[in-house]
């Protein structure tokens, strides 16, 4: 199965060149597979130096993810990456090392989805070797980080997140509810700078508070809310096997 790379981005033309596009090139992914989704024509202009296919989508990360699914045909295998991915890393002998062959990883991940009759995969949400498990794949309800995931496109409204903020948590829930499982590779993590300047998200504190409450109201059986020391609202998913 041929795959495409979808990168939603906003105001980071230099960042994407130095990070995600370099990461993909180093990992053996051809530029012809890569689509960068931007908010408007002005943004499209500043991304021209990337020499990738630029698609004018919509504003807002949740809306952009829906646009991406609508853009590609049903059955297309899509790998979604944020624009500031420095590396994908894998756990080896208790340490995180660079995952060098991304083409092979993306291809193998698709084969696993087909084998398990599931439609979305993700990676471990925290880059911390102490908590990760070498070679372990789970199918239970576990959070799939929006920075890097792959899915077989079905273009179903039932799978579209509505929360602007924590849309990746809602996406995880929606796929699990529909398919009875989601694949997470607990030995793979991403090196990136979360909540960096620019990007599609803003006013994170207020957005997280609002999104957390919305998710708790919509999915009370699987969502609980906690607060970090800085007051930031976060969501936990109840593990359902």
Which residue ranges define each predicted feature?
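Active-site-proximal specificity loops/subdomain of glycosyltransferases
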Residues: 37-81, 86-101
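A structural signal for short, well-ordered beta-strand segments and their strand-loop junctions
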Residues: 78-81, 119-124, 182-186, 224-227
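Cell-envelope/extracellular polymer assembly enzymes that use nucleotide-activated donors
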Residues: 2-6, 170
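Short, solvent-exposed loop/turn segments at secondary-structure junctions
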Residues: 10-12, 42-43, 60, 84-86, ...
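C-terminal catalytic/acceptor-binding lobe
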Residues: 12-19, 163-165, 169-241
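Conserved catalytic core of nucleotide-sugar-dependent glycosyltransferases
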Residues: 88-169
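Short, hydrophobic beta-strand segments that form beta-sheet elements in well-ordered domains
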Residues: 32-40, 121
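Short, well-formed alpha-helical segments that are part of the catalytic scaffolds
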Residues: 7-28, 42-46
């Amino acid at each position: 199965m041929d795959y495409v790379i979808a990168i939603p981005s906003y105001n980071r033309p230099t960042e994407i060149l130095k990070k995600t596009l370099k990461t993909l090139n180093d990992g053996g992914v051809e530029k012809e597979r890569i689509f960068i989704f931007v908010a408007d024509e002005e943004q499209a202009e500043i991304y021209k130096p990337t020499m990738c296919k630029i698609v004018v989508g919509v504003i807002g990360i949740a809306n952009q993810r829906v646009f991406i699914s609508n853009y590609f045909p049903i059955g297309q295998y899509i790998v979604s990456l944020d624009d500031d991915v420095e590396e994908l890393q894998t756990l080896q002998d208790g340490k995180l090392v660079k995952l060098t062959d991304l083409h092979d990883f993306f291809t193998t991940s698709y084969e696993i989805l087909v084998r398990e009759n599931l439609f979305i995969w993700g990676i471990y949400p925290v880059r911390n070797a102490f908590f990760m498990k070498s070679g372990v794949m789970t199918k239970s309800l576990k959070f799939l980080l929006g920075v890097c995931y792959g899915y077989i496109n079905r273009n179903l409204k039932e799978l579209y997140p509505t929360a602007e903020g924590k849309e990746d948590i809602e996406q995880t829930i929606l796929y699990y509810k529909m398919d009875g499982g989601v694949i997470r590779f607990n030995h793979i993590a991403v090196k990136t700078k979360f909540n960096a300047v620019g990007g599609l998200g803003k006013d994170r504190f207020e957005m997280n508070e609002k999104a957390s409450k919305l998710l708790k109201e919509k999915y009370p059986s699987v969502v609980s809310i906690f607060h970090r020391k800085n007051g930031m609202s976060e969501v936990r998913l109840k593990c359902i096997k």
